[in-house]
């Protein structure tokens, strides 16, 4: 495979040994495919499957009125184009959504009064507007009210049946109490559970317990049927010596008989009591001709009857089925002369316990009617039951598809667990299902089978955005259904149309509520491209229908063997959410049932094949799967005779021939963020967790720099996140500037398609986290690019690779205590050269409303404000773009009418004569908050439709229209140039049969075309029909494109001039964007990729920094004590390898300088061959020269996780770069010039600046807001609060005996209201005396004591 456009500019040398046979799936596919399946927007209405939105409509409609005289049915739905595009929605605080039109059919029937027969009277069809449905952007996000949001996928327990026990915790004896639970997708939960007395109970929706047999009665079984379902019968025949029973060898294997076994034929004892009968002995008895055993009357006592016992003479039932055999019953039997007796085959010794029989005995009900009434009383306590209501309620519980839905997943799971064969579309429960569940539960109690592991990923599934939305929309439609039914009954059904019946508000409200306030609809983490990707791949066990933090135990949060290749064992938050919020592994995908699948490569007879299968956790348990690092020969065969494999969750050695699958890649175990950590295998898991989490907090820097030591994942993340722009088609770069790239396509050309692709770049946009989104082109005019090549870098990307931080020279050594406890000492060079400088954009907005006292006004005329404060405002009262603003500066001037006391008639007259007073308004301007500074970079003014625009709004609008016009003209020029070039190529050399006036017929030449105006080329007729068809297609495409451009321009201008939709009462809104350049400073947090984090303690002059023998000063000094106890040795290996990369880069830089001197690339090529050791290199000299220049700062390498560089590789590269293989160097003290006594580890490391900036945290207050009750200052920067002086601080002052300082702290500096006012007055007077009074909190205490009935009075003196 050839090198890509960016790949040949900077080749990353990989240390990976294991070839990857499967391409990694698109990282945000989970989101996009799920929502596409829900909307089915591109699928024609007739071809839509019964899933997603189609399924929701089908499940709710048709809706019948109560009299069944009319039916409203759903036909199809379609989406109209969205009103605003994504960018416009973000600017106007709107939701990016498409109007949903649903075709409804209303059928009205004629009902014959006498016969009740119905005939169709009228059918009306109509499109009904059903609200707006939010659309997903190309990046897998939603724009809701102007902000980008992500719907996080939810992990929940799969529908189906689960068996478990209480682990001996319920009963004091420690006895296991088994339970079964049938969980539907929608509907009532059904639980079965054993109690300590071995009676089986059932619960509906976790309500009061009932005997399980009550449910069986309600299902229509009687007592004998229940017993015959759960137990076999043993027939005893009367004989002279006692009773004979057939000998069944299977029943006696491994059993200790309680009594002697006697042969019925001979009377011999064949097995004594208490001695275990082996399987072999049991078989031998049968082989020796043992057919029946002889038992005495005592043996029958304690047995249970299988049938009702009837006295044949009187017809009286003297013993019922299930009754325990007693001496009286036995006597009665003998008296009636019974020759044959059926007993239930219940014998705990043979593994059949009397649980169902005991439940029957404990059940007070003995008929279906009684059971139904009992269930009704539990479900609807307080309501009087009737047989009809009880029956209807019971049917609705499990057997009505509208109220109960197992879902296809639930049915599949149930069939597998219970070994049933019900069809997938059987979504309700059946009698057979309930009986099978009870049989399995009883089997578990008898010691047969295993309980389920609820944390196994075969029992947990993922609900992605499409499914979550489907559930929410169903709720909205069900609310709407009730309203439709009521309206159908209350209107004249003959005259109404479908839209009169449908009120779409409940459906629209459900959608709005879901996207706006659901726990799973989250404000997107947009700090950098990695944080976006990770957020979209997140799996949460929280949210509606999920777990809660408080209830989740250790088991749910723990790593499970089935997580392998599906959920990352490393990336999860620290704190209360640990283990509840996870991330999908790199290669994982979600199947149609919602189970996570991981890819494996098929192995046949020890040989690897190219077949790749995706397996879910359930399927995987059946196979033996080798790890990706298993030794494989060059011919693709497993090398070792025995291979380490995972089989059903355990790791064992398996013979080579028995291996069925092998992992596709070592990194399929971990998530995207963890796969970006080089030498992950050398880091402790806790630190790797911090490393993967902190990469998501890295701030995009002004100059991005890809890591020298990477893992090969960087380009994949940059591409899939959408931060970098990739070419859609192969072509040549026609035009490039900062805001757009134009590519002339050279492949995939079609006369009906445009020949040029135009890519617009985002410039200095604000992200959700106030970081800066800026894209810049990396191509030049004339460059040839292929489809998929990166043509523009985005935030935190460098030549199409993720670049979260910078590569800096670090030394591990203590430095005068400035790197104590993870502090970081940095060189002044880092600040001077803007190495870690970032741009942050803050948005401030203000709205002018129409109040009861009059409209607010945005103006420059503000009362009691000097001209100095207004220096940055224009005539309209809005700050100018480019103004430097600091805390307290006015951004937008605004005045609000004051409320005043009623005026006397005289005052009204004076007011009418002399006009308004200035004092009638108060200043409510938008000011910069405390601690904030920056430069105004953009101002947007929004006016309500119909409100007059001020000069600033008009000038912004004029500029915007000019920009749109220029855009349209530029695009039209590009389009025309391309179209006429293609038209010219098409006409040249062909034979013209007609043309414009003066055009010579015959062969078309270039000169003839040059002499003819281009607009006349269309009139040239050719004798070649195929060519003419192409000309016509080209003309149609040109006309269509021109019309589309004009239409888009007019549409955008119309939107600009029309005015904006505003919230109620808002007349005008102004948004001001302020950019601030944040340099690195003490207090900022930095981190590496291995969980090594610290805070900058000091910025040291370059001359004081430790330096190398060649005079180069190190950039950063880190504490060596941060490594051994944290066990993240990966950072040391990265440092060494980074040092080697930089050394090799310098060597290549020297070779490049030689090329610049003598013009020959021979030296450069040989150096590159030495570094890349046979890897593919560019062919042309210009490409080689550019590669040499790009690599002069360091050779980038990839060390994939679990398959990266080993220690010998690192030493080899250090030697190759000309360094000591120990990786240590002699450093000199910058302050004295003396060498340090011992060698120091120096190297290059990729460090990140995290989004915990001291500027956002530091805060100071003199006076500010106070709490209403206690009158103490509020806390926190957001509330402009004070510094808390707590209990322990009070102890400190007490210990020092600083009585006056303490008194001041507790009174005038806190909540002594009168005292603090006096202090303020004293300061104004220039005085420094004050007197402390009573703190307000003491008054609160007194009031609280009085409220408790304790009167507290203060006495003076």
UniProtKB/Swiss-Prot annotation:
Protein role: DNA-dependent RNA polymerase catalyzes the transcription of DNA into RNA using the four ribonucleoside triphosphates as substrates.
Listed CDD domains: RNA_pol_B_RPB2
Catalytic activity: RNA(n) + a ribonucleoside 5'-triphosphate = RNA(n+1) + diphosphate
Broad class of enzyme this protein falls into: transferase
Annotated EC: 2.7.7.6
UniProt xrefs under Gene3D superfamilies: 2.40.50.100, 2.40.50.150, 3.90.1100.10, 6.10.140.1670, DNA-directed RNA polymerase, beta subunit, external 1 domain, DNA-directed RNA polymerase, subunit 2, domain 6, RNA polymerase alpha subunit dimerisation domain, RNA polymerase Rpb2, domain 2
GO molecular-function term, one example from the UniProt record: DNA binding
Gene Ontology BP, a term: DNA-templated transcription
Superkingdom of the organism of origin: Bacteria
HAMAP family (alphabetical): RNApol_bact_RpoB (MF_01321)
Record has Cell membrane as a keyword: no
Cellular component GO terms, alphabetical: DNA-directed RNA polymerase complex
Keywords recorded for this protein, A-Z: DNA-directed RNA polymerase, Nucleotidyltransferase, Transcription, Transferase
InterPro entries noted in UniProt: DNA-dir_RNA_pol_bsu_ext_1_sf, DNA-dir_RNA_pol_bsu_external_1, DNA-dir_RNA_pol_su2, DNA-dir_RNAP_su2_dom, DNA-dir_RNAP_su2_hyb_sf, RNA_pol_bsu_bac, RNA_pol_bsu_CS, RNA_pol_bsu_protrusion
SS bonds (residue pairs): none
The protein, known as: DNA-directed RNA polymerase subunit beta
Entry similarity comment: Belongs to the RNA polymerase beta chain family.
Subunit structure, interactors included: The RNAP catalytic core consists of 2 alpha, 1 beta, 1 beta' and 1 omega subunit. When a sigma factor is associated with the core the holoenzyme is formed, which can initiate transcription.
Keyword Cell inner membrane: no
Pfam families: RNA_pol_Rpb2_1, RNA_pol_Rpb2_2, RNA_pol_Rpb2_3, RNA_pol_Rpb2_45, RNA_pol_Rpb2_6, RNA_pol_Rpb2_7
PANTHER family given in the database record: DNA-DIRECTED RNA POLYMERASE I SUBUNIT 2
